[in-house]
Curated annotation (Swiss-Prot):
Entry binding sites for Mn(2+): 87, 371, 413, 443
EC number: 2.5.1.54
Annotated residues for binding of phosphoenolpyruvate: 126, 285-286, 308, 339
Protein's name in the database: Phospho-2-dehydro-3-deoxyheptonate aldolase AroG
Keyword Plastid: no
Stretches assigned to coiled coil: none
One GO CC annotation: plasma membrane
GO molecular-function term, one example from the UniProt record: manganese ion binding
Catalytic activity: D-erythrose 4-phosphate + phosphoenolpyruvate + H2O = 7-phospho-2-dehydro-3-deoxy-D-arabino-heptonate + phosphate
Species of provenance: Mycolicibacterium smegmatis (strain ATCC 700084 / mc(2)155)
Functional summary from the UniProt entry: Catalyzes an aldol-like condensation reaction between phosphoenolpyruvate (PEP) and D-erythrose 4-phosphate (E4P) to generate 3-deoxy-D-arabino-heptulosonate 7-phosphate (DAH7P) and inorganic phosphate.
Disulfide bonds: none
Pfam family, one: DAHP_synth_2
Gene name of the encoded protein: aroG
Listed pathway(s): Metabolic intermediate biosynthesis; chorismate biosynthesis; chorismate from D-erythrose 4-phosphate and phosphoenolpyruvate: step 1/7
Length: 464
């Protein structure tokens, strides 16, 4: 299948023209060097872009602007940001049970964090577009082209499957649209009921080896819910939840094809350019070159943007990202996602925060405790230890508390499945256990139990 519309490509309707200024900025951005891009035929990719330019978007401007408003609250210390989901989504796992399980886990974490923080938790999933991954090498250990995500090539260790195929751009769109549709349905129906989600958390406390530690907090949430019921509180917010969609803006052929110009009447009287493949997009550690296409592309779009900052980030470089990506000092526009590693975060993060805070910009500070703590197990699996993940979050909180700044959120790779990919946690997963259910298409994820355990631990940090 090469497209999802029944009109020949040469008859597809053109997009509304951009203003001269926007067109110039976009063309300039796309002309810059872009790393980590597929090596497919440019003409074939252009044909697929033409298809994607005509399809309904995955998100709409009003939703994106609503998220930006909620993120402004995070930037101002009035809310907390929880972002999580699969490291890499796959077409084969884009199923109702898998999506439901991931959404359920994110909702369970959010309830615990909301109570711990005593403030709203903004929920953003890695969903409906996380189909591409940067890789450290173009070739894998078998001499095949590296798997770069289902948007680009296949996972099977086969030369034909590993060829970069631009028709996968449209398959990615079709899968993203289906996932987004299901997520909207699930979160507006009974799955998001606060009482139901808390009952799942009670089950976790009852069955987890570490449950006794979290019994008191779960009991407090129980009493709070009982109090609201006794008072007759029946707000719609207790039955539904809003979860926004995010992915790494990596494959520029996909992102540029999903650009749409807003109706000025919908966006404060000004036509804005949105990447409507998602609500929120981030730039990865490997693609954040200041002179590169990814940063320049992010400058042009009106979506909220994140930037991953690893241990090589200097305070001066962080300030440059802030000035480039948040030129109007708009709270909610920019999230700085730090991924330093648990043994470096306490040393490297303070000068970065101090330098950025001195600019007066209100950015969101978010901790990614996953990517700086990856290692190879004795059994040959890429893994992460739960204790190191928790320690990086703890270090992140310690730094912010010392500086008087707001630890704005966490960004984690999780799944609603009972996989064995990360070591430790209350289940005490060991190197020899990893082979049992090691199912990730890329990096190791926290399973449901580990995700909830992390949420309870972060809730304790939020209360301290």
């Amino acid at each position: 299948m090469n497209w999802t519309v029944d009109i020949p490509i040469d008859q597809l309707p053109p997009l509304p023209p951009l203003s001269d200024e926007l067109r110039q900025r976009l063309d300039s951005a796309l002309a810059k060097p872009a790393v980590q891009q597929p090596s497919w035929d440019p003409d074939a990719a252009k044909a697929m872009r033409t298809v994607l330019e005509s399809v309904p978007p995955v998100t709409v401007p009003s939703e994106i602007e609503k998220l930006k408003g909620l993120l402004a609250d995070v930037a101002q210390g009035k809310a907390f940001l929880l972002q999580g989901g699969d490291c890499a989504e796959t077409f084969v796992d884009n199923t109702e049970p898998h999506i439901r399980a991931n959404i359920r886990t994110l909702l369970q974490m959010a309830v615990v964090l909301t109570y711990g923080a005593s403030m709203p938790v903004v929920k953003v999933a890695r969903i409906a577009g996380q189909y591409a991954k940067p890789r450290s090498s173009d070739v894998d250990a078998l001499g095949l082209k590296s798997y770069r995500g289902d948007m680009i090539n296949g996972f099977a260790p086969d030369a034909a499957a590993r060829e970069h195929d631009p028709s996968r751009l449209v398959r990615a769109y079709a899968n993203a649209s289906a996932a987004m549709n299901l997520m909207r349905a699930l979160t507006s129906s009974g799955l998001a009921s606060l009482h139901l989600v808390h009952e799942w958390n009670r089950e976790f406390v009852r069955t987890s080896p570490a449950g006794a530690r979290y019994e008191a907090l779960a009991g407090e949430i129980d009493r709070g819910l009982n109090f609201m019921s006794a008072c007759g509180v029946a707000d719609r917010n207790l039955q539904t939840a809003e979860i926004f969609a995010s992915h790494e803006a990596l494959v520029l052929d996909y992102e540029r094809a999903m650009l749409r110009l807003s109706n000025p009447a919908e966006t404060d009287g000004a036509a804005k350019l949105y990447d409507q493949s998602a609500h929120y997009l981030w730039i990865g550690e490997r693609t954040r070159q200041l002179d590169g296409a990814h940063v320049a592309f992010a400058e042009v779009i009106a979506n909220p943007i994140g930037v991953k900052l690893g241990p090589t980030t200097t305070p001066e470089l962080a300030v440059e990202y802030v000035e480039r990506l948040d030129p109007n000092n708009e709270p909610g526009r920019l999230t700085l996602v730090t991924r330093m590693g648990n043994n470096k975060v306490r040393d490297l993060l303070p000068p970065i925060i101090e330098k950025v805070q001195a600019t007066g910009h209100q950015v969101i500070w978010q901790c990614d405790p996953m990517h700086g703590n990856t290692h190879e197990s004795s059994t040959g699996y890429k893994t992460r230890h739960f204790d190191r993940i928790v320690d990086e979050v703890q270090g992140f909180f310690e730094v912010h508390h010392a500086l008087g700044t707001h630890p704005g959120g966490i960004h984690v790779e999780i799944t609603g499945e009972n996989v064995t990919e990360c070591l430790g946690g209350a289940q005490d997963i060991s190197d020899s256990d990893l082979a049992g259910r090691y199912e990730t298409a890329c990096d190791p994820r926290l399973n449901t139990q580990q995700s909830l355990e992390l949420a309870f631990l972060v809730a304790e940090m939020l209360r301290d």
